[in-house]
UniProtKB/Swiss-Prot annotation:
Name this protein carries in UniProt: tRNA dimethylallyltransferase
Function statement: Catalyzes the transfer of a dimethylallyl group onto the adenine at position 37 in tRNAs that read codons beginning with uridine, leading to the formation of N6-(dimethylallyl)adenosine (i(6)A).
Binding positions (ATP): G17, P18, T19, A20, S21, G22, K23, T24
Keyword terms, alphabetized: ATP-binding, Magnesium, Nucleotide-binding, Transferase, tRNA processing
Tagged with keyword Transmembrane helix: no
Gene giving rise to this polypeptide: miaA
Site positions per UniProt: Interaction with substrate tRNA: T108, R130
Known partners and oligomeric status: Monomer.
Obligatory cofactor(s): Mg(2+)
UniProt cross-references to Gene3D superfamilies, sorted A to Z: 1.10.20.140, Crystal structure of tRNA isopentenylpyrophosphate transferase (bh2366) domain, P-loop containing nucleotide triphosphate hydrolases
Organism of origin: Klebsiella pneumoniae subsp. pneumoniae (strain ATCC 700721 / MGH 78578)
Length: 316
């Protein structure tokens, strides 16, 4: 897209970052000085009744800066990157129509990627094809299926471990349904985002500081009633660990504790470790992200000024 065309597009701001990096505080500060409306980009914050363990903005924060795509689903419901893209595009169009700028804030990098680049036209899952693959795996073993994938799609086979049956099965299923490899189809992305996007990533300067923040926040969550929050979900009887909501970091560890699988101290240790691993994955995504401006979460005023400078410069 050339500069002239891009300059004529409506503006949007992405504020990305790992968990516990200060995204919400910066987003609220930005709303005070820019004509922005916030859209949450977080696969955990979409769920109702999951407030403490997701560090959902509190009532005061939401009053200062309302977020869209927050509390839109029951924890029993699933939500895909395609669902997010559809809902985010509708919210963005609504915000622009009101003469304001969409500010998308969160840490679900897959959602940002889907929004920015569009989605690959992959076929929907087919239970019959999946059952056939699983039967073949039961008879021959997953290693044999991995060798089969290597012949069909060597690029995907190099990326997928033989001990990852879910992804291995999906790669074969895509080929059997469409006649095209996963690699071919993922290279054909959908529609690019029709906005002039300014992208920012906020994080502490050191990994140690981020780890420290994560541990402090996990203990704050426990002190704020996280166990009671998960007990209420556990008591419903219709939720389980195969659901995306209960697989969220912190929730799945607390679920194991409530299920009698691990002691309390082990739950705390695993919860902190899982959150750190999530943050590491988020930072890895961002390190490879093109066109992103980095912000130091320990310098909030400097971070705010940098966003204003970049967004303001595009108006000149």
């Amino acid at each position: 897209m050339n500069d002239v065309t891009e300059a004529s597009l409506p503006k949007a701001i992405f504020l990305m970052g790992p968990t516990a990096s200060g995204k919400t505080a910066l987003a609220i500060a930005l709303r005070k000085v820019l004509p922005v409306e916030l859209i949450s980009v977080d696969s955990a914050l979409i769920y109702r009744g999951m407030d403490i363990g997701t560090a959902k903005p509190d009532a005061a924060e939401l009053s200062a800066a309302p977020h869209r795509l927050l509390d839109i689903l029951d924890p029993a419901e699933a939500y895909s990157a395609a669902d997010f893209r559809r809902d985010a595009l509708a919210a963005m169009a609504d915000i622009v129509a009101a003469g304001r700028i969409p500010l998308l804030v969160g840490g679900t990098m897959l959602y940002f990627k889907a929004l920015l680049e569009g989605l690959s036209p992959l076929p929907s899952a087919d239970p019959e094809v999946r059952a056939r693959i699983e039967q073949q795996a039961a008879e021959q073993g997953w290693n044999a299926l991995h060798q089969q994938l290597q012949e069909i799609d060597p690029v995907a086979a190099a990326r997928i471990h033989p001990n990852d049956p879910q992804r291995l099965s999906r790669a074969l299923e895509v080929f059997f349904i469409s006649g095209k490899t996963l690699t071919e189809l993922t290279q054909t992305s959908g529609d690019a985002l029709p906005y002039q996007v300014h992208q920012f990533a906020i994080a502490p300067a050191s990994r140690e500081l981020l780890h420290q923040r994560i541990e402090q926040r996990f203990h704050q969550m426990l002190a704020s009633g996280f166990e009671a929050e998960v007990r209420a979900l556990f008591a419903r009887g219709d939720l389980h660990t195969d659901m995306p909501s209960i697989r969220c970091v912190g929730y799945r560890q607390m679920w194991s504790y409530l299920n009698g699988e691990i002691p309390y101290d082990e739950m705390v240790y695993r919860g902190v470790c899982a959150t750190r691993q999530l943050a590491k994955r988020q930072v890895t995504w961002l390190r490879g992200w093109e066109g992103v401006h980095w912000l130091d979460s320990e310098q909030p005023e400097q971070a705010l000024n940098k966003v204003l400078q970049v967004v303001g410069a595009s108006q000149n």
